[in-house]
Design a protein with these regions (language model features):
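Extracytoplasmic cell-surface/polysaccharide-interacting catalytic and binding patches
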Residues: 2-8, 12-119, 123-241
C-alpha cells in the first residue's frame, strides 16, 4: 500500500490542477485546489482503501469520495453516547466520551442542550442509507449529499451529527448553523476536539454538500492544529498522511 499510494496522490494532484484550471477560481485561503468534478457537477469517486486502517489510526484515517474503510471496520470499544451525559442516541469510541461530556457541559453553561442525532454507523447501515438516497433522489444527487458504504466518517466511531433538545433534526433547518446550537458548535466545538468536516462554501474541496451538524473528533490538540491550518479537514488529513 505504501508503494502504491504516492503514485495515486501524484495522479490525483495533477488531475486536481487540470480541473482547477478548467473550472475557474477556487475558494479563497484554502491552500488546495478543489476535487475533480464531472461536467454534471458530481465529485469523481474511487474505491481506494485508506492507508491508515488500524483502529489506533483513528486520527489519521481518511475516508472521502476516493478513500474508504474496509467492510469489516467496526471498533470494539464503542459505547453509548449517553455515557457522556448528552441527550440523543448512538455509539462512539470510548476515548471520545470525556471530551463529548465536556462539550455538552460547556454548551449547557451557554444555555444550549445538545442532542446527538447520529453517531457510529456500520458499513451495512451506510450502504442502506446511500441506497435510500439513490432510490429517492437518484445517483447524481446521492453521491453529492451522502457517502457510499465505507466512505462515511461515521463508520470510524468518532463522528457525530448534532442537533439540540426540543429541536428538529439538523438537516430540516434552512441552515443549522443559524440556530443557537449550530452557531455555538461552529464557534466552540474545536476547543473540545471536534472538527466540522464539511463547512459552507467548501463543497468543491470536501466532495460533499455543506453539513453544519457533522463533526469528527480529533482530540483537542489536533483540532486546534487543523483550525490553525486554514484547510478543510480532508486536505489537512491529506497533508498529514
Amino acid at each position: 500500500m505504501r508503494h502504491s499510494r504516492p503514485g495515486r496522490l501524484a495522479i490525483a494532484a495533477i488531475t486536481f490542477a487540470v480541473a482547477l484550471a478548467a473550472s475557474g477560481p477556487t475558494i479563497a485561503n484554502t491552500g488546495s485546489p478543489p476535487p475533480v468534478r464531472t461536467p454534471a457537477g458530481a465529485p469523481i469517486v474511487a474505491d481506494w482503501l485508506a492507508e491508515h486502517r488500524r483502529y489506533t489510526d483513528w486520527h489519521l484515517t481518511l475516508v472521502d469520495p476516493l478513500y474508504r474503510a474496509t467492510s469489516t471496520y467496526a471498533p470494539g470499544d464503542l459505547v453509548p453516547v449517553s455515557r457522556a451525559g448528552i441527550a440523543g442516541r448512538g455509539y462512539v469510541r470510548r476515548f471520545v466520551v470525556a471530551d463529548l461530556a465536556a462539550l455538552d457541559r460547556a454548551a449547557r453553561a451557554a444555555g444550549i442542550r445538545l442532542r446527538v442525532v447520529s453517531a457510529y454507523r456500520s458499513y451495512s447501515s451506510q450502504h442502506s442509507v446511500f441506497q435510500s438516497w439513490v432510490e429517492r433522489q437518484g445517483y447524481a444527487t446521492a453521491i453529492r449529499y451522502s457517502a457510499r458504504a465505507g466512505h462515511s466518517e461515521h463508520q470510524l466511531g468518532t463522528t457525530l451529527d448534532f442537533s439540540f433538545v426540543g429541536g428538529a433534526d439538523p438537516w430540516n433547518y434552512a441552515d443549522f448553523a443559524s440556530t443557537r446550537a449550530g452557531a455555538w458548535l461552529k464557534a466552540n466545538a474545536w476547543r473540545y476536539g471536534f472538527v466540522l468536516s464539511y463547512p459552507k462554501g467548501a463543497e468543491r474541496l470536501t466532495g460533499y454538500g455543506y453539513e453544519p451538524w457533522h463533526y469528527r473528533y480529533f482530540g483537542r490538540s489536533l483540532a486546534a492544529q487543523q483550525r490553525s491550518s486554514g484547510l478543510v479537514p480532508r486536505y489537512w488529513l491529506w497533508r498529514r498522511n
